[in-house]
Amino acid sequence: GTSIGRDRAPRRRVEDGPAGAHGDARRRPHRAPAARVQPSGPALFMDYDLEAEFKVMHALSTTSVPVPAVLFVETDTSFLGAPFLVMERVDGDIAADDPPFTVEGWVLDLPEEQRALLADNSLKAMVDLHNQNIVELGLDNIGHGNPELSGFDRLIDYWAKKSEWVLEEKNPTISAALEWVFENKPDDTDSNVLSWGDARLGNMIIAKDQSVAAIIDWEMLSCGPRELDLGWWLFLLKHHSVGVGAELPSGFKTRDEEIARYEELSGHKVRNLHYFEVFAGLRMAILVARAASLLKSAGYIPKDSPMALINPATNLLAELL
């Protein structure tokens, strides 16, 4: 069902589906709420789908995957000027991106054994997500782009369109990577799991015992092979270390160790990973190019800044091609 206010658009509430692992929202006290408001002006992403994010988090609340308890999503823009999603606040720490956790912050302050526990727990949470049955959860056709295309083809098509939307000048690395991704697409990309999209430590809320309290930030959600998230995960670890001239902190696994641990935890033999690391680099480079455009428009960087062409993501992507 839906809850409809006076002359308001339908508001989807958590009561619309099963109560789930977090309990029935109607029968228990809520924690302090937090709202995720869709950008109303120029933004990083070409489109947003808070209803899809609501659907995913609500469905996952019935599983062992840690997600914030969602309360409702509101599509009526008269309240806050844009659609918004309301969920319960989750206490914990978040690994920083700017400067990255590899350079300073609470992750570096942890003893090495605690850092190793954090790194392993974060990978376990992603494996747990990938192990969920998306058909049973009703999430097997979720994601951005043309729904008439199958999982991964839909995603490639979407990011090709996004690159056209983003690029204001020629970007040889992105163009070469996009061509490479289309020409080298593996034949076996039909293995569909729920892909978090922006799969990285910085999008997890970490409890004091270094367990994952919640997986957050689902703007890039889709369906696809497990390697879709794993490739992004590994590329971002490299981006936050080699890409910025820093070392991966002790306690974190090397690339090969991380792959082996993923296989051990999941029982899945990782394949075509180089392809998905290139695809991760392509997506990250497109996002950085968009960020550069937004920063120029806002006057934070000069109009002739080479940020869209020269940045850690694009540099690492060029090395992978």
Where are the regions a protein language model picked out?
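ATP-binding pocket architecture of kinase catalytic cores
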Residues: R8-A176, W180, N184-T189, D209-Q210
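Hydrophobic residue at the +6 position relative to the catalytic HRD Asp in the kinase catalytic loop
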Residues: M204-I206
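Regulatory N- and C-terminal appendages and interdomain linkers associated
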Residues: G1-R8, L294-L321
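Acidic, serine/threonine- and proline-rich low-complexity regulatory regions
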Residues: S266-Y275
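Active-site activation/catalytic loop segments of kinase-like enzymes and analogous catalytic loops
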Residues: E227-G267, A280-A298
